[in-house]
Amino acid sequence: MKKEKVVLAYSGGLDTSVAIKWLMQKYSLDVITLTVDIGQGINLDEIKNKAENLGVEKAYVLDLKEEFVKDYIIPAIKSNAMYERVYPLATALSRPLIAKYLVKIAKENGAKYVAHGCTGKGNDQVRIDLGVKALAPDLEIIAPVREWNFSREEEIEYALENNIPIPVSRKSPYSIDENLWGRSIEGGILEDPWQEPPEDIYLWTRFENREPSYIEITFERGVPVELNGVRKDVVEIIEELNKIAGSYGIGRIDHIENRLVGIKSREIYEAPAAIVIIRAHEALEDMVLPRELAHYKKMLEDKYAELVYYGLWFDPFREALQAFMDKTQDRVTGKVKIKLLPWSFSIVGRESPYSLYDHGLATYDKGSTFSTESAVGFIKLFGLQNYLYALKGGNND
């Protein structure tokens, strides 16, 4: 009898390596793996070979860096997307892209199932499941880690018993997720929120530079297009900024996060490029957006980040918010100067042909063009409602 097929999102890590054998043994399925290159910086050929050696029917490896940046990271930059105003959503942004290609590969191969290695406590299970169901409601989803209830130690034992090579030891039980936009580290001592993270968990943010330096990022309609006066594609800009800012130790995040599933968790992230780009983008927006638009956009940015974090990328609400965000970027064009320091950075300059900053109006020096005479009438009209309220004794209640 012909076996049914399952397409597994495969990272080469502990959970998904064990999942290959588990899906074969538990469900008697032919396993097809999908590995996407979104800037992890790992040897994808080795991962493909590893999957094939574990007996999969096919092992797909797709370079999706350009699509990841164009369709997910750039919209997030335009939206200054930071969950709880801290986390730039590197992992969350990648999940709808993975879901999209799980569906695509499943349809191409006539697979009835898709599978992933997300845990039953995390957010990623929601993001992948919702993404798949939004695009292909008929596909069935298997989440082995959610079903088998292995502890980390039991999972390692299973791998050893089944001759599955794994990049995890009992001395280093960290779960790591990485892409162009950031790196997350979980597990082990990090689960104690009082304990300082060991220095050896950090790879992108090593403190190597002590002397201050300056960088300049040029944006066109909200998109970074130049770094230090040299035009580059966004992938290159992100890669270079991860190295440059990371060498100052910039981009570390140690955060108690409110997960979608209702628990609080201690999250460690590295995101040098994401933090610098978003802060520079915000600084440029401060210069070019009218006040009411700037203030309202800030409120919607929080909701946008929540929707992405919650796995609602394909939701009409997120898409409607994206249309708003895109419109706000019509004049977000200009240059931002950033000073890099050990462990920190500052926005120290910005310029734009659409700047609403007028030196003549803003200066307190002689030659100011601001009409102070107009201020009296403005104040009267602006405070008219409060004035009338006070006349009626409203403040005496």
Curated annotation (Swiss-Prot):
Pfam families: Arginosuc_syn_C, Arginosuc_synth. Keywords: Amino-acid biosynthesis, Arginine biosynthesis, ATP-binding, Cytoplasm, Ligase, Nucleotide-binding. Coiled coil: none annotated. Its EC number is 6.3.4.5. Pathway: Amino-acid biosynthesis; L-arginine biosynthesis; L-arginine from L-ornithine and carbamoyl phosphate: step 2/3. GO terms for biological process: argininosuccinate metabolic process; L-arginine biosynthetic process; urea cycle. ATP binds at A9, Y10, S11, G12, G13, L14, D15, T16, S17, G117. It is an enzyme of class 6 (ligase). Gene3D superfamilies: Argininosuccinate synthetase, chain A, domain 2, HUPs. It is found in: Cytoplasm. It catalyses: L-citrulline + L-aspartate + ATP = 2-(N(omega)-L-arginino)succinate + AMP + diphosphate + H(+). GO terms for molecular function: argininosuccinate synthase activity; ATP binding. CDD domains: ASS. Homotetramer. This is Argininosuccinate synthase. It comes from Dictyoglomus thermophilum (strain ATCC 35947 / DSM 3960 / H-6-12).
